[in-house]
A protein has these predicted regions:
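Active-site anion/phosphate-binding pocket segments in diverse small-molecule metabolic enzymes
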Residues: 99-289
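Active-site-proximal beta-alpha core segment in soluble small-molecule metabolic enzymes
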Residues: 1-120
Length: 289
């Protein structure tokens, strides 16, 4: 379980499932120890150290709380210790500082005569970005399992996993001047042949994380990204057969319109959408090959 919890019902369910829990606070440790004792078992846990994410975990200076788990909580078996890196995709100096702070806690744990178990800090970005850095006992791969990383890495050897697939449900010609999508965002300069595909943002296409950071430098970065997309005419596309075709106008909730003027295709032809599986709606049928 990769998050800490002090909620009794969650802890009971996890223990019944024989799961390994995360302990990231004194409250969680006390709750887990008590419930495990009541259930007449020992809970296996990994202790989370917060070196910068600010979510779950003991801060490096809270070692008394960490040592209390080993000393005063007999129903807890510590089998691991970890931290999570918040900028491994770009800020190497900051990342190495986080790793050093984490390793200091691990070293102090051992100096006090306690065994931290499996030690791990590396996420997908750290695995591919921190070449030459000792990665301890294990790595926690997330986005790399989908063949995607948070930074450009030409030699990762990864292949994208997962795509959305639908079929062409409508083919028609639009006259010059006709518009496509909400707001009429696309206007045809000439007569064009279009295909309508019954798949849109409600299924996970053309969705992205909200820009939720309010630092000035992030705002500048977002503006520059938008300018680049505008100047380079970067567009969304889908794949029909072995050809990429551009999306026209705004993607709708349930539909996407594409330009097939120069493509030989027919109703019912398969259409592939390149998309991260992380954004695909739970309502979409999944097939594993």
């Amino acid at each position: 379980m990769m998050r800490s919890t002090a909620l009794e019902d969650e802890i009971e369910s996890l223990l019944k499932a024989n799961a390994i829990l995360t302990v990231g606070s004194n409250e969680a440790a006390v709750a887990i120890n008590g419930i495990a004792g009541r259930m007449n078992l020992r809970a296996r846990v990994h202790i989370k150290i917060d070196t910068g994410m600010g979510r779950y975990g003991f801060e490096p200076g809270e070692f008394e709380k960490i040592s209390a788990i080993f000393t005063y909580m007999p129903n807890i078996e510590v089998c691991g210790m970890y931290t999570h890196l918040n900028a491994a995709f770009g800020n190497k100096k900051k990342t190495l500082g986080q790793i050093a702070a984490f390793h200091a806690v691990v070293a102090k744990t051992r100096e006090q005569g306690f065994e931290p178990g499996m030690v791990h800090f590396a996420n997908s970005s750290a695995l591919f970005k921190l070449r030459g850095v000792e990665l301890d006992d294990g790595v926690r791969i997330g986005s790399a399992f989908t063949g995607r990383l948070a930074f450009a890495c030409k030699d990762s050897g990864l292949r994208k996993v997962g795509y959305l697939e639908s079929r062409i449900c409508e083919i028609r010609w639009l006259t010059r001047g006709a518009t496509v999508g909400y707001g009429g965002a696309y206007r045809a300069r000439n007569a064009i042949k279009i295909a309508v595909i019954p798949l849109g943002y409600s299924h996970g296409f053309a969705t992205e994380k909200i820009r939720d950071s309010y630092r000035f430098r992030d705002g500048v970065r977002f503006v520059l990204q938008d300018i680049k997309r505008t100047l380079t005419h970067e567009r969304l596309w889908v794949e029909i057969g072995d050809k990429r075709v551009p999306v026209l106008g705004h993607v709708g909730m349930l539909h996407t319109v594409v330009d097939i003027t120069n493509l030989d295709c027919a109703l019912g032809d398969a259409v592939r959408f390149d998309i991260s599986p992380l954004y695909v709606s739970a309502a979409v049928l999944r097939k594993y090959i």
